[in-house]
Amino acid sequence: SANKQIATVTNSGKVIGKKEGNTKVTVKLTNGKKLICNVSVKSNKYSGKKLTISDTTYNQYGLKVYSAYFDNKGNLVVKFMVANNSYGKLTKIPKLKITVKDSKKNVVASFKKNSYTINVNSYKSKSYTISIPKSSLKKSKDKIDVRTCTFTISGKDADATL
């Protein structure tokens, strides 16, 4: 590897990404020829569009995951938006559930809470963050590609104060 801080190559020939960036990997064949391959290492992060009031049906509230990544301890950090397109302040979401599925539709992580406390005023949106501990992950963080995962978020009717 031209830059060992970006990517390294094992003795068996496997390329391992170290940190985000670009580098070149040179391979010397048994016949003496050299092959050069450009390698691009991308961070294991999911990012999507944030939910807005205009995306939410009138007199309803909406939930949407817009960011996910692994922290330094291996926990999956998920950020989501709550958009309140109704009169009254939302104070909690009963039975909040976030499910993370990989590209093969297998559940790799989930988060459940019977009552998740929020504070979203009428016709406003707000961002919230939860952390799914690495002990709750169904696979190791090295085997989960967050960029290709699908996120499902749901909750029962949120409690509102008028």
Regions found by a protein language model. Name each.
Residues 1-45:
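Extracytoplasmic soluble-region selector
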Residues 10-11, 61-67, 111-116:
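Short structured motifs
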Residues 46-72:
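Low-complexity, acidic Ser/Thr/Pro/Gly-rich terminal tails and inter-domain linkers that flank the onset
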Residues 47-50, 132-162:
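Surface-exposed edge beta-strand/loop patches
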Residues 76-84:
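Short, well-ordered beta-strand segments enriched in hydrophobic/aromatic residues
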Residues 83-122:
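The feature marks short-to-medium sequence segments in extracytoplasmic or secretory-pathway proteins
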Residues 106-147:
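Short, solvent-exposed, Trp/other aromatic-anchored flexible loops in extracytoplasmic proteins
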